Amino acid sequence: MTHRRLSQAIAEGDGISVLVHVRDADGARRAEESGAEGIVISAADADVRPHTLLPLLAYGPEPEAAAAADAVVLQAADEQSLHALAERCAELGLEIVVRVRDDDELGHALEHVDPEIVLLTADAAEEAQSPLDRVLELLPDVPAGKLAIAELVDASREDVEELERAGIDAVLVAGDVEALVGDGVPDV
């Protein structure tokens, strides 16, 4: 199988790239038609592959379960198996995206796996902190030359514009791409 490079799609996109979580082939087609740069699936949604030319980013416990994908999300919180899973992904030709919730996880991921792509999530946000603020708090610790994806499933157009101004390369959402970018990528 020829894998499509998620990193290339993000880097070559105009402005901030939008990655959309879909559950089926229709969702993948709609996301592609709306201007998404990539599709996010669970490893169980492998039947999406024949219906899109966009790179597929899979969430899944084992790289083998994501064989139809082009990249796989690994959890930095899983320190015990992160390095072994990253090696297995490399053997399978899958790009690695390491999901981090805090500075400690980011430091561990950079030291032990050194991923090209880092997924910043707001899972560890304090109650008074917005998910957007949490992601933006993590961004300065991502080294230059790495691609940063923000995981904000309920992002608004204003959130996407703020993420782009801050230097985020892509945003992972669960919603309608057109509502976030309108006729194109936000101008900032």
Named regions from a protein language model:
Residues 20-21, 59, 74-75, 98-99, ...:
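Glycine- and other small-residue-rich loops at beta-strand/loop junctions that grip anionic moieties
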Residues 19, 27, 37-41, 97:
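Beta-stranded membrane pore/translocator domains
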Residues 9-19, 49-61, 69, 87-98, ...:
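Short beta-strand/loop segments at the ligand-binding rim of alpha/beta enzyme cores
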Residues 1-6, 41-62, 74-90, 104-108, ...:
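Active-site-adjacent beta->alpha loops and helix N-cap segments on the catalytic face
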